Structure formats: structure tokens, C-alpha cells
Amino acid sequence: HLRFIASVGEPLNAEAVWWGKRVLGLPIHDNWWQTETGGIMVANTPAFAIKPGSMGRPLPGVDVVVVDHDQETGEVTVIDKPDVEGELALRVGWPSMFRGYLGDEARSRACFTGEWYRSGDLVRQDAEGWLWFVGRADDVIKVAGNRIGTAEVESALVSHEAVAEAAVIGKPHRTAGEA
């Protein structure tokens, strides 16, 4: 008898959570982790009602912040307002956390800022602490000076009942940058 369904990896669209509830009789609990973190750090635990489309909340003992990383100066600033897009950062120090990329010192230095590991995932955190995946920092296209996360556009497209799957890529444009 199936009692619990969890997912980790690519973020689930909210529609998948509703599908699980409708077809399987159980919601799908989406979770977040990276190989670099060594385990699930953010989760939709069974103790709380699921917010479909959310990655969940940090597990007890896991400190996360949303940061703004200035590409030009390298400065990292913690965003302390809810619902503002930024990069997910986790406080380092748990035993399973990787120490760096083998043979790639520059990449290793780039993802650690002080006591924080910058994940490369763009998120927003609501006032209740739930995290919402926006896209990858390296998966953003620039259109007429605006940064657009392709995952956000894909999510909007697949929320329509006539769309099963979607993929968004940037196409070079003379005046808009990408379109």
C-alpha cells in the first residue's frame, strides 16, 4: 500500500503534485538537494501541508539565505525581503558537504563566499519560509535588459491544460539581446 511519494531532482511543476493527488490519491512531496550538499536540505515534509510548486522549507539545522551576487564586483548581499529572486545559499559545515571540485580550484572558490555555499539555483522565499525554484543562475536569458528564468516561462506554459511539456531557450536578437 503506497503511503508517501517524494521527488528530488528537477523541480516539479505544481500540476504534477495535483496529478499525484488526483490519480494516485497522494500528493508528491518535492524536495531539494544537490550532489554537492550530500543530502536533502530543503523539503516538503509530511508534517506540513504541501504548497504545490514549492521546493519546501529548510530542514531543521539547515541554514539557508537568498543572496544577490553582483557579477562585476563579486559582492554577495543577503536579501532579507520575501518574494525577491536571488541565489540559494546554504551555511557550510555539515559532514556530507563537499569541500570543492576536484581539479577545479577556480570553480570551487567561485561557489563559496565566506560561510556560505552558493548553489547556482535561483529561488524566492516567501514570508513563511517556503522556497520556490525560479531557475539556474546559468540558465537565464536576457531580453531587452531583463533577466528571465527559462524555468519560470516553462512552468507558466505547462500550467495550461493543453500543454504537457515545454522547453524555453534564448535565440539571439539584434536589439533585444535574446528573444
Question: Which residues does each PLM region occupy?
Answer:
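Short, P/G- and charge-enriched loop/turn segments at secondary-structure junctions
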Residues: F48-S54, E75-T77
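Conserved ATP/PPi-binding loop(s) of AMP-dependent carboxylate-activating enzymes
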Residues: P58-G61, E72-A110, I148
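AMP-binding/adenylate-forming catalytic core of the ANL superfamily
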Residues: W94, R99-G100, R107, L122-A179
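Gly/Ser/Thr-rich phosphate-binding loop
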Residues: H1-K51, D63
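Active-site phosphate/pyrophosphate- and oxyanion-stabilizing loops and adjacent acidic/basic residues
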Residues: W18, G53, A106, S155
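Short coil-to-beta-strand transition motifs
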Residues: S54-G61, Y117
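Active-site glycine-centered loops adjacent to acidic/histidine catalytic or metal-binding residues
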Residues: G9, W33, G56, D121, ...
